[in-house]
A protein has these predicted regions:
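Non-catalytic cap/lid and distal C-terminal segments of serine-dependent acyl enzymes
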Residues: 1-250
Length: 250
């Protein structure tokens, strides 16, 4: 497996941001780490081995990015506006700086540019879903595992424009039927998977809420609920990837 390390300056975040690329051709996949995680977690938690059949066969190239959750979602004692502004800077880094870099690498590898799949577990799933639902023009598929899709756990009753814009269960119900994103959702694939065992209980309500919203809006996101023995942990996430990745790529 070809692995490449990159470090690029981010004007939005005013710092260098690191990422790794796994593979040499195929559909681009953006991996977002768990809460306060780093780009190396894709490799550190052996997810590269789980994805290896698709990476080594040239079906996907995985781009593992960095988070700044410790300055945003996980900075619970800090000013809420400051935290969500930091997250929005990260969102803009992803969409206006990292995505063009991904497109550049993919054009070099494949000879063309295509939509990017978002992938993550836990808080990485929240980011993956939010990126997909906010920018389906950039991200044409989503694979979110064991995520939280409202932000009350992190922001309580506080809500401003940026909190609203980063919470799918807030903004999706108000998306007009004639918005061009609706056609994009309906012609793309997305899946949200969750267990019902230990440490998943707090995540199930927002998952079910998002499930209901998508059904009401006619957004064909696929929701899969695994058993009560399925915990919020990497061993289960490793099992979920080969179960659904062929469908997403099909």
């Amino acid at each position: 497996m070809e692995v490449r390390y990159e470090k690029h300056w981010s004007g939005h975040l005013n710092r260098e941001m690191e990422f790794k690329i796994y593979g040499s051709s195929g559909k681009p996949v953006l991996f977002i780490p768990c809460q306060a995680g780093r780009f190396w977690d894709f490799e550190g938690f052996n997810m590269d081995k789980t994805w290896a059949p698709w990476i080594e066969s040239g079906q996907v190239m995985v781009f593992a990015c960095d988070s700044i959750d410790n300055e945003a979602w996980a900075a619970l004692g800090a000013d809420k506006r400051w935290r969500i502004e930091n997250h929005e800077k990260w969102f803009n880094y992803i969409t206006t700086e990292l995505v063009p870099a991904i497109n550049h690498f993919c054009y070099q590898a494949n000879g063309y540019v295509q939509g990017i799949m978002t992938f993550g577990a836990s808080m990485g799933a929240m980011h993956a879903a939010n990126l997909y639902y906010r920018r389906p023009d950039l991200f044409d598929s989503c694979f979110a595992i064991s995520g939280l899709y409202d932000n009350k756990e992190f922001f309580g009753d506080y809500c401003d424009d940026l909190v609203y814009n980063n919470c799918p269960v807030f903004y999706l119900p108000n998306l007009p039927e004639d918005h061009f994103y609706m056609d994009m959702y309906r012609n793309q694939k997305s899946i949200i998977v969750i267990g019902q065992g230990a440490w998943e209980e707090a995540l199930l309500p927002s998952t079910r809420q998002l499930d209901t919203i998508c059904r009401q809006k006619g957004i064909p996101t696929r929701f899969e609920y695994w058993g009560f023995d399925v915990n919020h942990d990497w061993p289960w996430w490793h099992k979920m990837v080969p179960t659904y990745l062929p469908w997403l790529l099909g």
